[in-house]
Amino acid sequence: MFNFVKKAKQNVLHDLGPLYHKYSFFGVDNDQLPGMYELNQKAKVPVITAYIAYAIAKSKKKTSDNVSFTELFCADGYYAMVASRLGCSISIGIDNDRDKQLKNAESIAQRLNLNNVEFKKEEIAPSSKFASTDIIANVGGLYHVDNPEKILELSYKMANKFLIVQSVVSLARDDEDYYQAPAPGWTWGNRFSRKSFDKMLKKICPKIIDRHFNELEGNDRLEDRGSMYYLIEK
């Protein structure tokens, strides 16, 4: 009986096909999209999950306190679901669904028995009027847009207590004033260097609790390989 239940949990997402993320955090052994996704998730998830857990813990004075969370540019809503599992009372994922990953988010959340997660298909722009929540995660969105500073300002304004940021940076350039839009080889997006992204972020977000850098080993080009992480307190 135990083995049957365990097998059912491992295969609960099987019919959805390969997914953007591996859901092993939830005890599910699903198939993942081929290519860069596995290696890049291994780089990003430990850092971002740790930041989410820290922000939730520091947002509570009593165990009964409610904590709210929003993931901007959420794709399949993975981190909104992680925040729910780690104790957020309400968790929201927002994405324009350009890459057609959001369509699976509600189904995945339901199968994982996460009943306090909601998803919104909307464009994220400087003029957006989203509700503020205790924790905002902008992880993987800033390098996709034409106006990263304005989107970072929006993200910071939305956060009542903590902002979590992750973005791709170029390892091909190292000068502190480097900025290119569109991103090299792309028709959209942008690129900073490590130094220039750090300089830009510190202008908007003064209270950095922790920062981290690693490489996205699933990306071959130096222009796409750097990954910066920040945990910011309001």
Residue map of PLM features:
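Acceptor-substrate binding/catalytic loop of class I
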Residues: Q180-S196
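Conserved beta-strand signature within the Rossmann-like core of class I S-adenosyl-L-methionine
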Residues: K161-S170
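A short, conserved alpha-helix within the catalytic core of class I
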Residues: H144-S155
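Conserved class I S-adenosyl-L-methionine
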Residues: D65-A75
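Conserved SAM-binding strand-loop segment of SAM-dependent methyltransferases
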Residues: N113-I124
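A short SAM/SAH-binding and catalytic strip from SAM-dependent methyltransferases
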Residues: I135-D146
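Class I SAM-dependent methyltransferase SAM/SAH-binding core
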Residues: Y78, V82-L114
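Conserved alpha-helix/loop element of class I SAM-dependent methyltransferases that forms part
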Residues: L39-D65
